[in-house]
């Protein structure tokens, strides 16, 4: 375990950020109860996904592993931006590397896992966590912006954040995630 790094779990990326947002003044009053209900449903969906997996081994993660944090040089690829590094399930560092239609994502994931398993075993049950982790990331991201809203740089960079439209879009996005978490997980290869 990291000595000074938190875990990525339902509490740290879902429950705590949700409470922060619901106790703040960012969500318009006319949307707050709708948001509260959608967050409750979303977190219940996340719990169901974790229940499907059972025991989850936690490993050291990059935490924000996507193509924007992969720098290519003459020596090859290098990961950057480790400030979100934490303990969590291995799939967290894999799912954000995927893009496109489901068939494309299956192919990408299969290729990633072929290389990944040269270094570490992968528990295919963690595929049930992809949409749950996406949901937690969406919740955490809104709280991350809200917690830094007093910084003028954030107000300049995220002008759309403190608007009615932003929160309407988040409600719709979370409703879509609630449905996605009830779908079968992404499956790849013969063993996954």
Regions found by a protein language model. Name each.
Residues 90-121, 137-153:
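Active-site activation/catalytic loop segments of kinase-like enzymes and analogous catalytic loops
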Residues 13-20, 42, 90-93, 109:
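N-terminal alpha-helical segment
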Residues 4-7, 110-116, 153-165:
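Short alpha-helical "patches" and their helix-cap loops
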Residues 44-94, 190-192:
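Active-site acidic catalytic loop and adjacent metal/ATP-binding pocket
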Residues 15, 25-26, 143-192:
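ATP/Mg2+ or Mg2+-diphosphate-binding catalytic cores
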Residues 37-41:
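Charged, amphipathic alpha-helical oligomerization/scaffolding segments
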Residues 124-134:
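All-alpha amphipathic helical-bundle segments outside canonical DNA-binding/catalytic cores
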Residues 1-34, 58, 157-158:
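A cross-family kinase active-site recognition segment
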